[in-house]
Amino acid sequence: MTYWNRRKKQQLLYIFVDILSSLLVWGCFLIFRWMVYDGRVFSVDTVFIPMFNFYTPLIAYPIGCIIIYYLSGYYLRPLRKPYLRELLRTFISAVIIALGAFFIFIIDDPVTQYERYFMSLIVLFALQFLGSYIPRWLVTFISHKLDSDTPRTYTIHNMKEVELFEQAHSIEPYDEVILDLNSKTKEDTIYTLINRLYPLNVEISIVPSLYDMLTGAAMIDDVSDQPLIHITEHKMSDTELCIKRAFDIAVSAIMLVLLLPLYLILALLVRVSSDGPIFYRQERIGLHGLPFEIIKYRTMCLHAESATPQLSADNDPRITKVGRWMRKYRLDELPQFWNILRGDMSIVGPRPERRYFINQIEEKAPYYCMIYKIRPGLTSWGPIKVGYTDTLDKMVRRLNYDIVYIENMSIKLDIKIMFHTIGVIFNGKGK
C-alpha cells in the first residue's frame, strides 16, 4: 500500500472515530443536563420536548464536528502529527464546537438560573475535548505500534542509489525518501532526482545545507526530528489548504448546477459546428506528478492532433469557428469544474501540461517538478501574466510565475487571481 493510500485509510479511520466520539459526547452531555437540572436521568418531557433540541443534534452535531476538524487541518497529515500541535488543534476545535452548539441548541432553553448556561458550556467543552482527544490519541498510538502503519523511510546519498531504491520500493512501498546529498551536488542533478522520484508516490525531503538552515527553509515537525526541507509539501498552513479545498468543492458544485443551461447550449453549438464528440479528454500531469484526464469542450476539428502534439497558435486552422469564440472567453474550460469537484484540480493552481511538453520544459527548467506539490488549477498567476502559451519559452515564463505563486500561495492571493481572471474572461483575451 502506497503512502498516499495509507494516508487516505488513516484519514477515514480518524473521521469514523470522530463521528462516534461526537455522538457519545452529545449523549453524555444530555445525560448530564437531565441528571443535574431535572433531577432524573430520563423523562418523557425532557427527551421528547422540544424535539428539535434532541433529535437535530444527533445529525447536526457530528457533521459540525467533522467540518470544524477538517477546516482545522487535522485530517491533512494523519500519519505525521506532532502531539503538541494535535493537542492545540483539538483544544481550539473543541472551543469552537462548544460555542457553536451552545448558541444553536442550548441558549434558547428555558433556564431560571443563568449560571447553568455557563456550566453547560464548560461541561460541553470538557466532554468534547476529552472525548475527541483521548480516542484520537489511542488510534495514533495503536497505529504507530503496528508494523503495517509505521512510516517507512529510505535515505539516498547519490544518483547511483536511486535504482536501488526503485527496486526496493517496487517490492515493498516506502513512505518517505530523504535526500542526504553531498553539498557539491549540482542543482540540475537534484531536480533530475526529484523528477524521477515524484511519480513513485512518496514524500520527498532534503537534508538542508547551512544556508538553508540560516534562511529558514529547513523545518522540523517535532523537537526530536531532524531538520528537513519537505519538497512535496506547500507553503500554505493546513487550515488554509483545507479552506481552499472546501472552497473548490463548494464553488465547482454551485457552478455545475447554475451554469447547466449554458453547458447545454455550448454542447449543442459544438455538436452542430463540426463532426466529433462534444467533450475533449486529454491526459495531463497533476498532483504528485500523477496523470489525470482533463475535460474540455472540443474546439478543434476531429483528429487535429493525430500525430505529434502541437501548441495552438494565432489563426490556427485546426480550430473551429465556434471553438475560436469559446476560447476567446475561456468557455471551453468550463467542464473542468468537474475535474475540480473530483479532486484532480483546484480553481487556482498551475495549469497542467502534457508529458510531451513537460519533457521539453524540463530541459530548460529542470525545476518543473516543484509544481507537483499542489493541485493544478483552472487559472493561476502564470496564465494571467503570460496568457496562452504557444511557444516553449512562454511555457517556461509561465512556469516561473507559477513557482513564485507556489512560494507565496495564500487564500488572499487566490482571491486576487480569481478577480484578475474574471477581468481576462470579460475582456475576451483568450485565443
What does each model-found stretch correspond to?
Residues Y211-D212, A218-I220, F279-T320, T379-R398:
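Short, glycine-rich, amphipathic interfacial segments at transmembrane boundaries or analogous
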Residues M1-L146, K431:
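Signature of alpha-helical transmembrane segments in polytopic membrane proteins
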